[in-house]
């Protein structure tokens, strides 16, 4: 490992006029490293996030379609209830004298129950959409945080080792010794 490090150190001392060399100054290259890591995270994370969001969008759209089908069924039931209402109204004309008030109550009950069912289905659809959106947002946040944390830990573990620490400490001790002399 020391030979490899020494070879990189010797590469860092190439003449700078018109040639390519390695910059071993950690403070000068840290900004470049961070920008490279962020660029890699954006480049590779974008596809994962878009796939995740597309899947979540499909689920939400499927939920909306299911809710719309339920709504269509409720509308169909409403139409059936209306036809029954018409039938009941025809019978009401025949029995107006005896049972008009009872028929009117039945009609109102049909309308109220159908209206209540439609409202419940609409509320269920809206709650499902909101829940799926919040769940998708939370999953995306968690995924981005995990990827950023893994990238940062990978960068730290690849950049730091014991030999580099010891060399940095020795260099700093040497500079402090030179300052105090």
UniProtKB/Swiss-Prot annotation:
State the taxonomy lineage.
Eukaryota, Viridiplantae, Streptophyta, Embryophyta, Tracheophyta
One short Pfam name that applies is ATP-synt_B
Localization in the cell: Plastid, Chloroplast thylakoid membrane
How is this protein named in the record?
ATP synthase subunit b, chloroplastic
From the UniProt annotation, give the residues forming the signal peptide: none
The UniProt record lists the keyword S-adenosyl-L-methionine:
no
User: Any other noteworthy remark?
Assistant: In plastids the F-type ATPase is also known as CF(1)CF(0).
Q: Subunit info?
A: F-type ATPases have 2 components, F(1) - the catalytic core - and F(0) - the membrane proton channel. F(1) has five subunits: alpha(3), beta(3), gamma(1), delta(1), epsilon(1). F(0) has four main subunits: a(1), b(1), b'(1) and c(10-14). The alpha and beta chains form an alternating ring which encloses part of the gamma chain. F(1) is attached to F(0) by a central stalk formed by the gamma and epsilon chains, while a peripheral stalk is formed by the delta, b and b' chains.
Keyword Transport annotated:
yes
Question: What gene name is listed for this protein?
Answer: atpF
Membrane topology per the record? Single-pass membrane protein
Q: Which residues cross the membrane?
A: 27-49
Task: Show the GO MF annotations.
Answer: proton-transporting ATP synthase activity, rotational mechanism
GO cellular component term of the entry, any = proton-transporting ATP synthase complex
Family classification: Belongs to the ATPase B chain family.
Its domain of life? Eukaryota
CDD domains hit by this protein: ATP-synt_Fo_b
